Regions:
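Structural detector for short beta-strands of small beta-barrel domains
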Residues: 1-18
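Short, surface-exposed secondary-structure boundary micro-motifs
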Residues: 27-29, 63
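Extended, hydrophilic extramembrane loops/domains of integral membrane proteins
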Residues: 43-79
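Transmembrane alpha-helical segments that form the functional core of multipass membrane systems
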Residues: 87-193, 200-213
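Juxtamembrane helix-loop transition segments at the membrane interface in multi-pass membrane proteins
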Residues: 149-159, 178-190, 224-236, 287, ...
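Pore-lining and gate-forming transmembrane alpha-helices of multi-pass membrane transport proteins
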Residues: 160-164, 195-212, 258, 262, ...
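Helical hairpin unit composed of two closely spaced alpha helices linked by a short loop
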Residues: 215-223, 229-278, 282-283
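Hydrophobic alpha-helical transmembrane segments of membrane transport and translocation systems
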Residues: 268, 272-333
């Protein structure tokens, strides 16, 4: 954006709205740059500086004929996002070294699985739940082995993740069915039912989202729990399986209390505006708000993920105690 030609603050549905006429510079087909007038509007919220300033990178859209006017759709945030991503990659490599590199490769595989398998599979009319579960299994296996290497305790974490993920799929299906959720609680779900995408199974899509969301937290707790039991076993190889399990459970209890709270805060942070609306809503009782499709979906998502975390601890601990305590899979001289 080059210059502000004019601006004013109007009112739309009782809310102040900023309206600006600005001069922007856009590239042309011949490689040169052209200056055009464009309109920009934004709701003035919380005193935030949403007004455009000279030097801002913006996304300009041209309306179709016969008007062919220009308007600013949004700010171009590609450069700051690329910078933040570069900092993330640099820190992962600098602090994680080889494991940091392999974890980034695992992240890349996750993106590829989602973009090339899960999304196309859902768009082709396949069951969103089945596609998401298969994608989650591939993501779990690839990301855990790449991030933590090939070892007995990593294989224990992978097996525990797959078992817990399968149980979570059944649990999510039961919870969605009992709560009578249909996956239509968000604006995005509404748009998916329009046009060519109306064949998408929204309930299956909701279930698939719950499963994919559980993979990341399961990865964390199963690898950490398997590592804890392994270290206890190395410190005292003479411990019987039962004692190894009990000591591992003691560590797992700490994992549960911290990660359940972490999972809740992750959802709460993403839905902070919704929490604020709860506090100022005086038109209907709280139980009515909680029963709405959108809120109930988030509650089920959080609770299923938390239950998956809780189940992962005894499953991983029992498997690790048995395999490590009895020397299953150990190469003997």
């Amino acid at each position: 954006m080059v210059e502000i030609i004019g601006e004013r603050v109007g009112e739309v549905v009782g809310s102040p709205q900023l309206q600006q006429i600005v001069l922007v510079e856009i590239p042309t087909a011949g490689g040169s740059r052209e200056r055009v007038r464009a309109e920009f509007s934004a709701v003035v919220a919380g005193g935030a500086g949403q007004a455009l300033r000279p030097g801002d990178a913006v996304i300009v859209v041209k309306s179709p004929p016969p008007d062919q006017t220009y308007f600013v759709a949004d700010r171009d945030r590609s450069r700051p996002l690329a910078f933040i991503a570069a900092v993330f990659v640099a820190l992962a490599v600098l602090l994680g070294r080889l494991r940091g590199v392999t974890s980034l490769v695992g992240l890349g595989i996750t993106v590829v699985v989602l973009a090339e398998f899960v999304v196309p599979g859902i768009l082709s009319g396949a069951s969103p739940l089945l596609v998401s579960v298969l994608g989650a299994l591939v993501i779990a296996v690839a990301s855990i082995y790449l991030a933590h290497g090939f070892s007995r305790r990593t294989s224990i974490a992978v097996a525990s993740t797959l078992i817990t993920l399968t149980l979570s799929a059944f649990l999510a299906a039961a919870a969605v069915s009992v709560a009578r959720l249909f996956g239509s609680g968000t604006e995005e779900a509404f748009y998916l039912q329009l046009g060519l995408l109306k064949q998408v199974n929204l309930r299956g899509l909701l279930l698939g989202g719950i499963i994919l969301g559980a993979v990341g937290v399961l990865d964390d707790i199963t690898t950490g729990q398997a590592a804890a039991v392994d270290e206890i076993h190395k410190a005292n190889p003479a411990l019987p399986v039962r004692e190894l399990y009990q000591r591992g459970r003691s560590v797992g209890t700490e994992h549960i209390t911290s990660l359940v709270n972490t999972l809740f805060l992750a959802y709460a942070g993403a839905s902070l505006p919704l929490f604020i609306l709860f506090t100022i809503n005086t038109y209907q009782p709280l139980w009515v708000t909680l029963s709405s499709e959108f809120v109930a979906e988030e509650i089920v998502r959080t609770l299923v993920g938390s239950i998956a975390l809780i189940l992962a601890v005894p499953i991983t601990t029992q498997m690790a105690a048995y395999v490590l305590g009895r020397g299953v899979g150990q190469v003997r001289p």
